[in-house]
C-alpha cells in the first residue's frame, strides 16, 4: 500500500513548485509587457510632439527649437500633471482606462513662411508620425515572419506598438480641442 502513495507524494511535492514557477514566469512576462507598453506609449507621444515642432521648424518657426523641445529626451516632454499624476491616479484606482499627455510643443504661427498650409502641416505631423510607426511595425512583422523569426512574444510586442500608435493617430484626429483634428478642421473651414 505504501508503494501506491509514493508517486502521489512525489507528484505533489514537484507539482507545487512547478505551478509556482509557471505563475512566477507569467507574472514576469506581464511585467515586461507592461513596462514595454509604458515605454512605447511614452515614446510614441514624444515622437508625435517632436513631429509638431519639426514641422513648425520646417515652416520657419524656431520656437520649439529654441525651447529645446526637438529632442528625444523624454524629460523635456513630461507634463507633471498629464504624464505622471493622471496616469498614476488612474492606475492606483484600477481604472479600466489609462491615459495621459505630454507637454505640447510650443510654436508661433506668425513666424511661418508664406505657406498657407503650414498650420495644417504642423497639426497633421504628429498623426503622420504615429501612422508611420504603425507602418514600421507592420513591416517588422512581415520581415520577421518572412525570415521565420516570429514567436508569440515578438508578435505581442509588435501588436503593442501598432495598437498604441493607431489609437494615438485616430484619437488625435478627433475634431475637438485640444486634438490635432480640431486644428486641421479649423484651418480647412
Positions of the model-derived regions?
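Hydrophobic transmembrane alpha-helices and their immediate loop junctions
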Residues: 2-189
Amino acid at each position: 500500500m505504501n508503494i501506491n502513495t509514493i508517486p502521489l507524494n512525489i507528484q505533489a511535492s514537484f507539482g507545487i513548485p512547478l505551478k509556482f514557477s509557471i505563475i512566477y514566469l507569467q507574472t514576469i512576462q506581464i511585467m515586461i509587457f507592461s513596462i514595454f507598453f509604458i515605454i512605447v506609449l511614452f515614446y510614441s507621444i514624444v515622437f508625435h510632439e517632436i513631429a509638431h515642432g519639426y514641422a513648425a521648424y520646417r515652416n520657419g518657426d524656431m520656437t520649439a527649437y529654441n525651447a529645446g523641445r526637438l529632442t528625444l529626451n523624454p524629460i523635456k516632454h513630461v507634463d507633471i500633471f498629464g504624464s505622471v499624476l493622471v496616469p498614476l491616479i488612474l492606475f492606483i484606482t484600477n481604472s479600466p482606462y489609462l491615459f495621459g499627455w505630454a507637454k505640447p510643443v510650443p510654436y508661433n504661427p506668425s513666424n511661418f513662411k508664406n505657406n498657407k498650409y503650414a498650420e495644417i502641416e504642423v497639426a497633421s505631423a504628429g498623426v503622420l508620425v504615429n501612422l508611420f510607426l504603425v507602418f514600421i511595425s507592420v513591416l517588422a512583422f512581415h520581415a520577421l515572419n518572412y525570415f521565420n523569426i516570429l514567436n508569440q512574444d515578438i508578435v505581442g510586442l509588435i501588436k503593442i506598438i501598432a495598437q498604441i500608435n493607431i489609437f494615438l493617430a485616430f484619437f488625435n484626429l478627433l475634431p475637438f480641442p485640444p486634438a490635432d483634428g480640431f486644428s486641421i478642421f479649423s484651418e480647412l473651414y
